[in-house]
């Protein structure tokens, strides 16, 4: 992979997802922002014993300028995400689970919103929809939080919380100041998101794109 800079980097920890990871990667490749010019994927194989690693290696060979493949001994999702941070070359970063996916307009809408509000926020989030076994809005996307794209000041609108890392995008400069805590077995992503929001007491919501949560 060259020293090229990207608009968006996506870090995907990979473990036992050979049935789903190709669909996840394809949802990033098909982004209407233009994958080869503007998007980087960092695939971190967390010592997966199934065929996930082979699938990831094939994609990295197909898109050598855009996809970085990294192998590590199994250490958990937090360590895998922290490992992925060492390879990012994008202005904004998403941590995507390896069995989820994005709507095709997600990256372009998020990038434009960030550029319009760059000095105000470190984080932008999108609504989530359940798919496959269950369908409908994710419990964290119910209510009127995503009724319109806007900047939320949590000091004024403290009821509009955001906890889910995979539906969020973070400025890479801000992201590098915080690591995921590998000692936490649950809720490590919520802690990470909250730390990012508290830096400015504001974050953005974009109403149109959808993060699909399996």
Can you say where each PLM-predicted feature lies in the sequence?
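Conserved donor NDP-sugar-binding/catalytic core segment of glycosyltransferases
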Residues: 105-138
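Short aromatic/hydrophobic "clamp" motif used to bind/position activated sugar donors
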Residues: 93
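Short, well-formed alpha-helical segments that are part of the catalytic scaffolds
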Residues: 17-31
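Conserved nucleotide-sugar donor-binding catalytic segment
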Residues: 148-214
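Short beta-strand/loop segment that forms part of the nucleotide-sugar
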Residues: 37-47, 68-73, 98
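Cell-envelope/extracellular polymer assembly enzymes that use nucleotide-activated donors
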Residues: 6-9, 40, 191
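Glycine-rich, basic loop-to-helix element that forms the pyrophosphate-binding segment
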Residues: 72-88
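A conserved acidic beta->alpha catalytic loop
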Residues: 27, 45-54, 75, 97
């Amino acid at each position: 992979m060259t020293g090229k800079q990207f608009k968006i980097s996506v870090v995907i920890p990979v473990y036992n997802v050979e049935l789903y990871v190709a669909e996840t990667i394809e949802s990033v490749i098909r982004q209407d922002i233009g994958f080869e010019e503007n998007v980087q994927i960092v695939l971190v194989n967390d010592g997966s014993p199934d065929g996930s690693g082979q699938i990831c290696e094939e994609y990295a060979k197909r898109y050598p300028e855009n996809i970085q493949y990294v192998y590590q001994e199994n250490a958990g999702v937090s360590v895998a995400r922290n490992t992925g941070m060492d390879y990012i070359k994008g202005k904004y970063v998403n941590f995507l689970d390896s069995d989820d996916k994005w709507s095709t307009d997600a990256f372009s809408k998020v990038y434009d919103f960030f550029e319009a509000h760059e000095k105000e926020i470190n984080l932008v989030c999108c609504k989530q929809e359940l798919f496959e076994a269950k369908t409908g809005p994710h419990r964290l996307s119910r209510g009127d939080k995503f009724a319109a794209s806007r900047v939320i000041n949590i000091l004024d609108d403290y009821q509009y919380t955001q906890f889910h890392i995979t539906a969020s995008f973070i400025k890479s400069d801000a992201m590098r100041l915080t690591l995921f805590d590998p000692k936490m077995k649950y809720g490590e992503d919520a802690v990470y998101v909250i730390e990012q929001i508290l830096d400015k007491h504001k974050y953005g919501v974009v109403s149109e794109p959808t993060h699909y949560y399996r």
